[in-house]
Regions:
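P-loop NTP-binding catalytic core
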Residues: 38, 42, 48-109
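N-terminal anchoring/assembly modules that precede and organize ATP-driven motor systems
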Residues: 1-53
């Protein structure tokens, strides 16, 4: 991995901080945010997703995360290109939706 790729990975890692507890949980199979302030988590074997309030997951934090993931994958996410389909450096799928495609302040799964 070259220096640029390493630095992008560090920035993504920092941007993932609001959802870190669920990323590190081996029972979690899906993490979704349908806007600022809350996360929905699906755990292996559970019948429904769990809702969690996450005050640090602001509109800015969602946009920042999407921009970092986009940069890592050689893409951009902005008002002209509000949809992002990429992967995190560790291989997890990342789908992002930013305004104006959503009015909720951004979303990801």
């Amino acid at each position: 991995m070259n220096a640029l790729a390493r630095s992008l990975t560090v920035f993504i890692d920092r941007a993932l901080e609001p959802i870190r507890p669920w990323l590190e949980d081996d029972q979690v199979v899906e993490i979704c945010a349908n806007g600022p302030g809350e996360v929905w988590v699906e755990r292996f074997g559970q019948p429904a997703m769990e809702r969690h309030e996450v005050s640090s997951l602001t509109e800015h934090a969602i946009r920042h995360l999407a921009e970092r993931v986009a940069g890592h994958s050689g893409q951009s996410v902005n008002e002209e290109h509000p949809l992002l389909s990429a992967a995190l450096p560790t291989g997890e799928r990342f789908q992002g939706v930013m305004p104006p495609a959503t009015t909720a302040g951004g979303a990801f799964a």
